Amino acid sequence: AADTATTHRLLAPSHARLAAHDDAIVRAQITVAQIAAPTGEETERGGWVSRRYRDYGLDDIHTDDAGNVIGRRPGIADLEPVVICAHLDTVFPRETDLSIRRQGDRLVGPGINDNGRGIAVMLALASEIDGSRVRSRRPIEFVATTGEEGVGDLKGAKHYFAKRGRNAHATIALDGAGDERIIHRALGSRRFRISYSGPGGHSWAAFGAPNAVHAAAGAAARLAALSLPSVPRTTLSVGRIGGGLSVNSIPDSAWLEIDLRSTSSNHLDDFERVIRRIAQIAADEENAKRSLGTRMLTVSIESIGARPCGETSPDHQLVQSAIEATRLVGRHPDLALASTDANVPISQGIPAIAIGAGGRGGDAHTHAEWFDNVHGTIGVARALTIVMAAAGVA
């Protein structure tokens, strides 16, 4: 923490320059939010980020096989890099109206906060850590990641940290607004699609054939009745269910999708086994009721998402530095749990946190999403101090 305080003082001229460019950072935020980037379709937004990397003179600018846009600022020493990442993708379909409008002090529109803010501030830091006014001891890699949201399943982060970033010294993910939260605990999740398939038929003439919807409903009912631990907190939800052709048909297929979350990898393992067992029990029960000579119902289980969990210890230097940097800008540190790009390095033992990039925001993942740049410069200064405390001021 003492090193963080020293770093913060040394960076005072940088904090002043970034504050002077506050309007430009917000303009970049508006620009990036208006470039469509649905999960899996981040190419156009990634290209815009790549051009900004070139404008700022980063080295080794490239797009990897997962679509991550990477740029590097060399350090004065040949050491493992500090990684700054911000996700490119949004939850909004391509056809969404991405216009950003002002409502009083707020900017309102899809993606203006999550993650237009994170991308804009990552680029502002890339511009300020220019190798002359501000130089770092360690190299710093700037990574605009793909597939952070929903079905993206942390695709970009998983690819980057499995390969190029596997030896990173530390990682700071910039995600949305805020200047107090320090996400050092990674909420893990597993998602499954259970599918039932049977012969189907007419609701009268084929009565007695196993009913795929009955099996799916039976599985959902059993899952809903499970007793889940509060410590470590574990949640399970049947998020979607469907099947059948018409009201007067015995469905030949049905499916349900399940979201399982926990802070414990052991609990994720345990409840995955429970889910698989219940899926089979529901099929067995429906088959036990079928008429002689009818084809049996079958069940399949597909994994449609897996986000790892873990924790960077609150006593670790990176977390302590983030706590001190938050206090140095006059804010109150809030140690938190969430699912972010930082899940991946945390699960691999790489020290990592996710933080907000300044200002205030709300209504994420809706068309009413908003950002208010109140004290936005404070969050930018905090982010720079945390990054440079990890990388070392040269």
Regions flagged by a language model, labelled:
Residues 24, 50, 54, 62, ...:
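Active-site metal-coordination/substrate-binding segment of hydrolases
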Residues 28-31, 35-80:
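A non-catalytic alpha/beta surface segment that caps or lines the substrate-entry region
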Residues 88-102, 168, 184-195, 324, ...:
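Acidic-glycine-rich active-site phosphate/pyrophosphate-binding loop
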Residues 98-111, 197-201, 327, 363-367:
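Glycine/charged-rich beta-loop-alpha catalytic/anionic-binding loops adjacent to active sites
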Residues 106, 111, 115-187, 229, ...:
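Acidic/histidine-rich catalytic neighborhood of metal-dependent amide-processing enzymes
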Residues 1-35, 186-188:
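N-terminal hydrophobic or amphipathic helices/low-complexity stretches enriched
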Residues 1-13, 34, 212-394:
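Metal-dependent amide/peptide-bond hydrolase catalytic core
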